[in-house]
Amino acid sequence: MLKLASLNRIVLTGTLLAAAGLASGCSSIDRLSQIGESPKLTAIDNPTTQPGYKPVQMPMPKPETVSYNANSLWRNGSRAFFRDQRAARVGDLLTVTVNFTDRANIANQTQRSRVSKDDSGIADFAGSKLLGGTAQKVLPGRLLTTDSESLSDGKGLVQRQENLQTSVATVVTQVLPNGNLVVEGKQEIRVNFEIRELIVAGIVRPEDIQSDNTIDSSKIAQARIAYGGRGQITDVQQPRYGQQVMDVLLPF
């Protein structure tokens, strides 16, 4: 059984290494064809047609009857005299101001120590020697002795500081039954041989949209903000495929 398990493990490891090598080879061919060229920007497309897209489902309140004000110059929820310029329908644009500043400094230290010692024997009982003569020489009076010691020492330190300030235009991809808007936007900027990507998605309440059709990222519910890149600099920062595979397979 042990030999069979070892054989299966070797076969699995070889299969994974072969797959990794094949993927690495295909990726290497693509990279060889792009030597000396800047990375290409992705095409503009409909985010709802992307693989893995799923409509947002949130708990909704009961529908309410819309009331209209008779003989009024203003429409409910309107902030402009002639027309509300804020995003309200699928396909409308909404500018998101990303202002993210995060700083964390956490330090933990734990120390634990425990020492126990037990010693038991039955050399004398009720005034008489239980072990005597030859038996006392062979069997010691101390029948059981235990000694244990446990020590635990742990330290943890987290220091993080992040700052991101930018703006990105998003598209309304869905209007929920309660009127909230699902927005998603992607921005790509190419500088030399590196592309910086900014992705913003989440749920927006129409009342939080400013009159200039902008909203702060802190007012987006279920916000998903990703800022990264791809290109030569990002490629150098990534470990090689073989190293990543070995990090997964090796238990130590």
Swiss-Prot record:
The basal body constitutes a major portion of the flagellar organelle and consists of four rings (L,P,S, and M) mounted on a central rod. It comes from Nitrobacter winogradskyi (strain ATCC 25391 / DSM 10237 / CIP 104748 / NCIMB 11846 / Nb-255). GO terms for biological process: bacterial-type flagellum-dependent cell motility. Belongs to the FlgH family. One of its GO terms (cellular component) is cell outer membrane. A lipid is attached at residue 26 (N-palmitoyl cysteine). GO terms for molecular function: cytoskeletal motor activity. It holds the Pfam family FlgH. This is Flagellar L-ring protein. It is a lipid-anchor. It comes from the Bacteria. Assembles around the rod to form the L-ring and probably protects the motor/basal body from shearing forces during rotation. It is found in: Cell outer membrane; Bacterial flagellum basal body. Residues 1-25 form the signal peptide. Keywords: Bacterial flagellum, Cell outer membrane, Lipoprotein, Membrane, Palmitate, Signal. Transmembrane segments: none annotated. A lipid is attached at residue 26 (S-diacylglycerol cysteine).
